[in-house]
């Protein structure tokens, strides 16, 4: 009850940013597992998963640089939201390919890297302007809790669902 009251006492921007961070923390493992499983299911080639991850981590620093220029014209909240939207676009792009080629996987990974880059570059700025010195530790601690909890629980839930579906419908 004390934690809920502490959350309620936070400024609106802090509460909205924490809610967004919590949603992202629970969705991100689903996206990552889905994309790796999709690549493996379509190609059974671990090198393609590695390529995808390499392109993701190539896209992040590229986005940080590009984001700096965009901030001159576009508010960080819009870029932050665009980053989350790009994650869905990456999945949509990859699953709509008629054939999962190396180039297609690379582009999907790069789009996901752009997604992460826009999210993280603008998230840090939004945290700084949405919190004060008095509640910033609360924010980061709560966000770290969500990330840790979701990072442990979501893979367990997803794997349980996959095993259930596999045994019930596949054999």
Predicted regions and their residues:
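Helix-to-loop junctions at the C-terminal end of transmembrane segments
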Residues: 63-76, 162-163
